Amino acid sequence: MNEVLAKGKKAKEIARELVLKSTEQKNEALSAIADQLILETAYILEENKKDIEEGKAKGFSDSLLDRLMLNEQRIVDMTEGIKQLIELRDPVGDCVSAWERPNGLSIQEMRVPLGVVGMIYEARPNVTVDAATICLKTGNAVILRGSSSAIHSNKAIVAVIHRALKQTSLPQESVQLIEDTTRDSAKQLFTMNDYLDVLIPRGGKQLIDTVVREASVPVLETGAGNCHVFIDETADKQMAFDIIINAKTQRPSVCNAIETIVLHEKWAEQYGSELFSSLKKRGVELRGDQKALAMDSSIVLASEEDWGTEFLSLTLAVKLVSSIEEAIHHINTYGSMHSEAIISENEENVSKFFVSVDAAALYHNASTRFTDGYEFGFGAEIGISTQKLHVRGPMGLPALTSIKYVIRGNGQIRK
């Protein structure tokens, strides 16, 4: 039996054990993982350095290297996320609803673990910690399959997690890493219906599209983040500047950074040139339509492809519109249903934007950078879903549960 099948079979066995573990036991395991990550920070960073050096040798972009890179602060941030997770209510065993039928049957809708979660992801080794801990909290076994670019980091983190779990009542194999990073291992994971209950892809558009297209296992789709901010005619200048600069430049390589600004022409007439200048001073390359070029000749003419691109870098598309309806049409045409924002003092337009724009998270007068499990108060997230079935938006603890119905009677038979 090869690695993928062997780990799938083991995960199925472990899932039956995990469903019996108490919240206290699961939290003890999470606490042990947080402590072990701090204890072995030097080891993790040493292994991460190998990935960074190999990435540089292969010519990885700065944005990809940033997603790949770990440092002491990022490891501390991981452990803080775990501590938040410990404090969160365990949804497993919760009674979602309960009712009694006229025949005396008592019916309860209960939350239960999904079972075995498969996670396939690119570059970011912090996902290894997020996925492992949120799955453990919800009583799920997890099979991790990262990319070759982060293999040293992922192997180190999982080894640390195993050493932590060895000190607890949870089996070490609750968290397993597929070390084979070839396409064959990924394709096998896609079709492992006998062992996987759900597969979650987390990465770029190409990875996600491949998983959605080829997997026979149920998929929780975490979409790419082609996010927009629409600056309405009534938008406050300073607020607009602050939000745009934050949403684009704070960390351009993440999925909740913006890729296009949509400007109302009347607002742009007053403040557009100054906004463009402010962005360029921060190293942002602007790609705009003809109206934007007429305001600033240094802007590169945007191609049709640019409007639908998740740049994940300091590149920003600029679209000028004459109405909110035109803005909404552009966003719904090119957006990825992730996070979209409007900056406006016109409540009617805000309401229209909220009703008409199709996305997991909609913002009024705030940065899209808040679409995140930590910022929503969920603790560590396993991804941001852009699909509509099962769950949408940042996927916290309830997203990794299903339901079962528990029916109690006193001898009823159906007539």
Swiss-Prot record:
Primary residence: cytoplasm
Uppermost EC category: oxidoreductase
Signal peptide as annotated in the record: none
Functional pathway: Amino-acid biosynthesis; L-proline biosynthesis; L-glutamate 5-semialdehyde from L-glutamate: step 2/2
Keyword annotations: Amino-acid biosynthesis, Cytoplasm, NADP, Oxidoreductase, Proline biosynthesis
Entry GO CC: cytoplasm
Listed PROSITE patterns: PROA
Keyword Oxidoreductase belongs to the record: yes
Keyword Ribosomal protein assigned: no
Catalytic activity, EC: 1.2.1.41
Chemical reaction(s) catalysed: L-glutamate 5-semialdehyde + phosphate + NADP(+) = L-glutamyl 5-phosphate + NADPH + H(+)
One example of a Gene Ontology biological process annotation: L-proline biosynthetic process
CDD domains assigned to the protein according to its UniProt record, in alphabetical order: ALDH_F18-19_ProA-GPR
Annotated localization: Cytoplasm
GO function terms (MF aspect): glutamate-5-semialdehyde dehydrogenase activity; NADP binding
Entry similarity comment: Belongs to the gamma-glutamyl phosphate reductase family.
Free-text function comment from the UniProt entry: Catalyzes the NADPH-dependent reduction of L-glutamate 5-phosphate into L-glutamate 5-semialdehyde and phosphate. The product spontaneously undergoes cyclization to form 1-pyrroline-5-carboxylate.
Record-given protein name: Gamma-glutamyl phosphate reductase
Species annotation: Bacillus cereus (strain ZK / E33L)
Encoding gene, per UniProt annotation: proA
